[in-house]
Curated annotation (Swiss-Prot):
Species whose genome carries this gene: Francisella tularensis subsp. holarctica (strain LVS)
Annotated keywords: DNA-binding, Transcription, Transcription regulation
Identification of the protein by name: Transcription elongation factor GreA
Disulfide partners: none
Any Pfam family hit: GreA_GreB_N
HAMAP family per UniProt: GreA_GreB
PANTHER family, sorted: TRANSCRIPTION ELONGATION FACTOR GREA
InterPro entries hit by this protein: GreA/GreB_C_sf, TF_GreA/GreB_CS, Tscrpt_elong_fac_GreA, Tscrpt_elong_fac_GreA/B, Tscrpt_elong_fac_GreA/B_C, Tscrpt_elong_fac_GreA/B_fam, Tscrpt_elong_fac_GreA/B_N, Tscrpt_elong_fac_GreA/B_N_sf
Amino acid sequence: MANDRVPMTPAGEQALRAELDKLKKIERPAIIEAIAEARDHGDLKENAEYHAARERQGIIEGRIKDIESKLSNAQVIDVTKIQANGMVIFGATVTIMNVDTEEETTYKIVGEDEADIDNQKISVVAPLARALIKKEEGDEITLDTPKGKVTYEIVAVEYK
C-alpha cells in the first residue's frame, strides 16, 4: 500500500508544500543554529538545551520525510476540471439534510490528510463520504451511527 496513489485536493497539496517549504527554509536552519549554540555551552552529557534541540531536529526531519512521502504518492485531483454531472465524487462539496430533523450540513470530501471536521472537510474514507460517493442530488443514504440509523438526503452537489 505504500506505493498506492493517495487522492488530494489542490489546496491540500498547496498546504503541504507550504509546510515543507517552512520546515526546510526556516525551522531546519533555526534548529541547526540552536544545536551549534547549545554545543558551545560545553559538556553535552548534561546539556538540556542541546538534547532538546536534537530532539526537535529529529521531529522536524521526520515531518519533512513524511510530507515528501505524501507528496510523492499524491494524486492531485482538481474537481473543477472534472465533468461529474451532479454525481458526488472526491473533492465535491455536498449539502445533506437529516430527513428526521431537517438539519442541513455541508461537507467537502477530501484526502485523509486534509480532513478537518471543524471546517466541514471529511476524509474520502470516512463512512459518510463512502456512502455519498457516486450518489446524486435527491438521493438518500442511510448510515448506522452510535445513536441508530440516520437517513440523509443529498440537497446539493457542488464542484468548487
